């Protein structure tokens, strides 16, 4: 079955996956925001807006390519994921 995700879900899943791969809630993005947006077939401004919303909601903090996950549970709720 094909699962369709919203932009917010895609970005949340991506951030959680990057955290898992880096074994840390504080990590650097390896691709540009443009490259990440293209991989989701969305516009760069949609990705940036989503990251700003996540930051405003207290889920993450960004500093350039650095991402810090502040509220993993909230981010997982957006991603519709559960801890494994």
Regions found by a protein language model. Give the residues of each.
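Short, Lys/Arg-enriched, Trp-marked, Pro/Gly-tolerant hinge/linker segments that flank
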Residues: 1-7, 24-27
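N-terminal positioning helix adjacent to the helix-turn-helix/winged-helix DNA-binding module
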Residues: 3, 7-10, 14, 32
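Phosphate-/nucleic-acid-contacting segments
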Residues: 18-84
